Curated annotation (Swiss-Prot):
Gene3D superfamilies: Enolpyruvate transferase domain
GO cellular component terms, A-Z: cytoplasm
Gene Ontology biological process terms in this record: cell division; cell wall organization; peptidoglycan biosynthetic process; regulation of cell shape; UDP-N-acetylgalactosamine biosynthetic process
CDD domains associated with the record: UdpNAET
Substrates-to-products reaction catalysed: phosphoenolpyruvate + UDP-N-acetyl-alpha-D-glucosamine = UDP-N-acetyl-3-O-(1-carboxyvinyl)-alpha-D-glucosamine + phosphate
Protein name: UDP-N-acetylglucosamine 1-carboxyvinyltransferase
Catalytic residues (UniProt): 122 (proton donor)
Compartmental location: Cytoplasm
Keyword entries, A-Z: Cell cycle, Cell division, Cell shape, Cell wall biogenesis/degradation, Cytoplasm, Peptidoglycan synthesis, Pyruvate, Transferase
Class of enzymatic activity (EC top level): transferase
Role summary: Cell wall formation. Adds enolpyruvyl to UDP-N-acetylglucosamine.
Major localization class: cytoplasm
UniProt-annotated binding residues for phosphoenolpyruvate: 22-23
Amino acid sequence: MDRIRIVGGAPLDGTIRIGGAKNAALTLMPVCLLTDQPVTLTNLPDLADIRTMAALLGQMGVGTLLNGAESSAGRHIDLDASGLSDTTAPYDLVRKMRASILVLGPLVARHGRARVSLPGGCAIGTRPVDLHLKALEALGAHIELKEGYIHASVEGRLKGAKITFPKVTVGGTENALMAATLAEGETLLENVAREPEITDLALCLRAMGAKIDGIGTGTLRVEGVDTLGGTSHAVVPDRIETGTYALAAAATRGRLTLTGTRLDLVESLVDHLRRAGVVVTAIEGGLEIDARTSALTGVDVMTEPFPGFPTDMQAQWMAVMSTARGASMITESIFENRFMHVPELSRMGADINIHGGSAIVRGVAGLSGAQVMATDLRASVCLVLAALAASGETIINRVYHLDRGYERVEDKLAACGATIERLRD
């Protein structure tokens, strides 16, 4: 099992190109199931989860062709579902990645049936799919749970409906939106998630011929159409990768230029960084992060749905706050059990106490390298940031989590002065 070795203590200095958003790409890939025309996605990140989704679609009979490699324009994938032969998403693939549930809505909407294994791929508390299923039932789908599978079917077409989500759900919004594009009549989706990845999905669907109003707001109005066409669509920049490398600059008191990204994707994080003492400047085609001349100050955060502070940045923020002046409170309001990185940070000398859904972080003079273990994707990169800031050597075990969400992380950091290498057993 791969490990990552880091010798920390040196400030980062250089340029990192931000890739396409993993969460957007995983949502966009299933749109091919809504049409018999080719769909091309560009600016695609090269990640394990992307390959898993491609394998899942391929097993259903979708033509999948991945191209490109290290080019600055990013990879692209050609998808063709005209020869779809199966509407089952099997356990052996779905268990690796919960985003697999996003094939459910498109399959039912266009093909009238789907059999999808209950998802896996994440160790962050309970992430139920009941809101996905209730939304599809509201559109007329018949849902049964049998032997670990979701069985969904509809006679004829789905029917438009008014759906008000009881709480904001990203995946539920995405599944309902895709299904509604081919439903008969109008669908009103209220209290929807407003993440940039959902805006990206809606813009892609609109380019395919979907009739969607309210993009970027909390209410989406969808007028169903008979068919959708193909399209070519560039995946939105990855705001979580953007934020992670911005925090890497802060953690090491360094300077990084991030290209291929946008300020509007990370405004909440940037606001918190500036309050902590980091200089963030919007430049053409990206951002410049400069933490060289300031002693960072502890700043409280509470995770919230977009446009609030993202839950996927909580662990990384904690790593930075571990060496900031004073104390900070980090409150996790989205997922339960998302402080699994705290014991590992504590092994490196961090002073953190958990009280319910909040963690109190008291900044220390410095962290020390140690043997640590990654428990999930964001905890993995949190430990990378802590190791970059720490004195001495850190070995991070179980980094397969890291490969699910970050492309060539060791190469990008090494190019900016980090002493980092992957150890293969």
